[in-house]
From Swiss-Prot:
Lineage: Eukaryota, Viridiplantae, Streptophyta, Embryophyta, Tracheophyta
One biological process term in Gene Ontology: response to jasmonic acid
Co-factor note (free text): Binds 1 ascorbate molecule per subunit. Binds 1 Fe(2+) ion per subunit.
Entry protein name: Leucoanthocyanidin dioxygenase
Regions annotated as coiled coil: none
Tissue note: Expressed in young seedlings (at protein level).
Organism of this sequence: Arabidopsis thaliana (Mouse-ear cress)
């Protein structure tokens, strides 16, 4: 196994300038600004906040209003802050505390959980290799593992320290799975489909996978030159994200980068490519990226809700296709879609393909 330099080790080594592999291309650098100043901006578009309190209300009108708000945000932005989502605040805190404690271990201790991408062992502790669209490195380390369904997990690679990691993360994954069902139902109704339709199309209760990725973005001596994660869209159906209230997430909306605010007790939710394909482009999978900073470590906990890799062919649903709105996406399995994005797919191509 090839030893990989961890970004955390690099950040703690006392360097004042970052290695050239981390410096973004000139055309990107023009749009990278101070994240704390960006977050304070009140003018211009803001990521919507959606209150899910009434998503299952017995009052039909109240329920419909909630579904309509969720639908609008999914058609327009494809990303939102969810509040009153039903996941206990103390459970979210436990998940964050467990992840923070794991990443506070020494790099040597974390290396016991190292993944090995070269051999296909993708679960575990890792750092980005230069196999992304730009061939460059990103300012982050991470921990990745399948979190749900329980029978498909490999607990042997989950952190043993802290002791609450497995219990807190397992409980959180169960709660997110229930939340995903509520969201899928609302988004199905929003498209004029039967409530259980979208969830069935992505594998249903048996096959939908929840993959947990804890992203650790160390302090960066030259944040104006680097990105924590480069611009991409999520391949998932839905992505749910917690963070440690340090700003960094940016969305490419109406031709400009918009910095997401930190909303207490919220969960950020992205619509992923999978739902964009099924809805024939109605629901948006938005291009997004992560900024880094000099002052504070940023940590985010992303859970990707993904269909099985080969069992389902993803294509626009027949109800979403018409003479006026022909299919925008060719049929492909989830595995083929991932491959399609990994190999030579520049963002410009992705965007132009969506607009074709």
């Amino acid at each position: 196994m090839v030893a990989v330099e961890r970004v955390e080790s690099l950040a703690k080594s006392g360097i004042i300038s970052i290695p050239k592999e981390y410096i973004r291309p000139k055309e990107e650098l023009e749009s990278i600004n101070d994240v704390f100043l960006e977050e304070k901006k009140e003018d211009g578009p803001q990521v919507p906040t959606i209150d899910l309190k009434n998503i299952e209300s017995d009052d039909e009108k109240i329920r419909e209003n909630c579904i309509e708000e969720l639908k609008k945000a999914s058609l327009d932005w494809g990303v939102m802050h969810l509040i009153n989502h039903g996941i206990p605040a103390d459970l979210m805190e436990r998940v964050k505390k467990a992840g923070e404690e794991f990443f506070s271990l020494s790099v040597e201790e974390k290396e016991k959980y190292a993944n090995d991408q070269a051999t296909g062992k993708i679960q575990g502790y890792g750092s980005k290799l230069a196999n992304n669209a730009s061939g460059q490195l990103e300012w982050e380390d991470y921990f990745f593992h399948l979190a749900y369904p329980e029978e498909k997990r490999d607990l042997s690679i989950w952190p043993k320290t802290p002791s609450d990691y497995i219990e807190a993360t397992s409980e959180y994954a169960k709660c997110l799975r229930l939340l995903a069902t509520k969201v899928f139902k609302a988004l199905s109704v929003g498209l004029g489909l039967e409530p259980d339709r979208l969830e069935k199309e992505v594998g249903g209760l048996e096959e939908l996978l929840l993959q947990m990725k804890i992203n650790y973005y160390p302090k960066c001596p030259q944040p104006e030159l680097a990105l924590g994660v480069e611009a991409h869209t999520d391949v998932s159906a839905l992505t749910f994200i917690l963070h440690n209230m340090v700003p960094g997430l940016q969305l490419f909306y109406e031709g400009k980068w918009v910095t997401a605010k930190c909303v207490p007790d919220s969960i950020v939710m992205h619509i992923g490519d999978t739902l964009e394909i099924l809805s024939n482009g109605k629901y948006k999978s938005i291009l997004h990226r992560g900024l880094v900073n000099k002052e504070k470590v940023r940590i985010s906990w992303a859970v990707f809700c993904e269909p099985p890799k080969d069992k389902i062919v993803l294509k626009p649903l027949p109800e979403m296709v018409s003479v006026e709105s022909p299919a925008k996406f060719p049929p492909r399995t989830f595995a083929q879609h991932i491959e399609h994005k990994l190999f030579g797919k520049e963002q410009e191509e992705l965007v132009s393909e969506k607009n074709d």
